[in-house]
Every structure is written in C-alpha cells, then in structure tokens.
A protein has these predicted regions:
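Hydrophobic or amphipathic alpha-helical targeting/insertion segments
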Residues: 1-27
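Low-complexity, Pro/Ser/Thr- and charge-rich linker/hinge segments at domain boundaries
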Residues: 21-39, 199-215
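Surface-exposed, gly/pro-biased binding rims or lids
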Residues: 25-27, 33, 48-56
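Histidine- and aromatic-rich segments of cupredoxin/plastocyanin-like copper-binding domains
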Residues: 43, 49-214
Length: 215
C-alpha cells in the first residue's frame, strides 16, 4: 500500500496492450504492427547515482523523489529507433511520478529555453486516442501537454520525410505554464530520435487516416 511512487521511481511504469481486432472496426485502418509501425513510448524523468568514473550505478530514489534530471523513453536515455517510410502509431504514456511534459516532434536537435521563442516548429501529428479511448475524429496536434499518468495516441506520417532523415521526440519546457515547471534542470531537448528507414516495410502499411474514429 502507498508504495506506487517509490516503485515507479525505482523501476519502470509500463503499459499493456488490450486489443480485440475482431470487434474493433478501426483495427485495420490504423497502424497495428507492434514494434514496426505501432510503437509504445513510456516517457519518464529519472535521477541516477554515479560512481567515480561517471558510470551509472543505480536509480536515485527517496521518500519524496523529485522529477529527475534525465529524460528516458522506454528505459533508454537518448535512444534511436528506425521507423518505416510511412505512417506510424505512437502510443505515449507519461510514466513519471511528478514531471509534466510538453511533447512534440521536431527536426531540430536542441533548444535552449532561455533564448528560444515561439518560432519553434513542431511537426504535425494526428491525435487519435487518449486514456478514455478513441476520439470522435483525428485531431491535428503539434505539441501536447502530458501530466503524470496521461496516455495519448498519435499518428505520425514519416512518409513525408526523406529516407535517412532524423526526427526528434522533443520536450519543450518553455511552452509549459510557469506552475508546471518543477525542475530548473529541464529545458527543451530531444528525448529520442526516429530515423526514417525505407528498408523497414510493414506487412500492411497505412497511407491515410480515417476521417472519423467513432460511428
């Protein structure tokens, strides 16, 4: 009892896929090939303990852990993933205990929030679902606020880029409300990279998004 915060801080908060292809009319219309064009992204902030050689020895945890100074996606800091040259479903979860994220896709690697302005360009995605299920219709979205435990699903069209292009999953702190900034360590930075790879070919690639998601 009452150990969720400590357990999440020390380990991983994950997600389970619950699907019923036979009774989901949208199953074949949205990317659904796990690990190829249907990707879970568990976004967290962690603190680490380091030894004298600057190697990570453990996750830093306490009775009241802070938001963490390191961004982590699926247990990896600075990860890289190759994605197909087509539409990809990104199932995002804020698995942090306290950190609010402002997440989007960018072509740029890094921003300094002390000098950045609203000219930052987030790439367009379409939000299709939240923790409550499918939306009525796909909503265009460029960046999105995630509170702890929030879940959102997006369709990103990597087919609009050239093979070999790199697109970054970026957290932009400068666009957060002032009361949501819990740590001065955080600024806008790439949390992971997607590399467009034309050699990755889904069995059933999706080339368009349905106009409506609910009857």
């Amino acid at each position: 009892m009452d150990l969720t915060t400590d357990q999440v801080t020390r380990g991983m908060a994950g997600m389970m896929y619950v699907q019923d292809p036979n009774n989901d009319p949208l199953y074949s219309q949205l990317p659904n090939e796990y690990g190829v064009n249907d990707i879970p992204l568990n976004i967290q902030a962690k603190n680490f303990n380091f030894d004298d050689n600057n190697n990570v020895t453990s996750i830093k945890a306490g009775e009241k852990p802070g938001p963490g100074s390191w961004g982590m996606v699926n247990g990896v800091v600075g990860g890289v993933m190759h994605v197909p040259h087509s539409m990809v479903r990104l199932r995002m979860l804020n698995g942090s205990t306290i950190k609010v994220f402002n997440i989007g896709l960018t072509k740029e690697l890094l921003y300094d929030y002390t000098t950045a302005n609203d000219s930052i360009r987030f790439e367009r995605m379409w939000m299709v679902a939240t923790g409550g299920g499918y939306l009525d219709y796909p909503r265009p979205a460029r960046n999105n606020l995630f509170s702890p435990g929030d879940r959102r699903e997006f369709i990103a069209d990597f087919g609009q880029y050239n093979p070999g292009d790199t697109i970054y999953l970026t957290h932009f702190d400068n666009k957060l409300p002032a009361d949501a900034k819990y740590s001065k360590h955080w600024y806008s930075s790439a949390m992971m990279a997607f590399v467009v790879d034309e050699t990755i070919r889904p069995t059933r690639p999706v080339t368009s998004i349905p106009a409506t998601l609910k009857p």
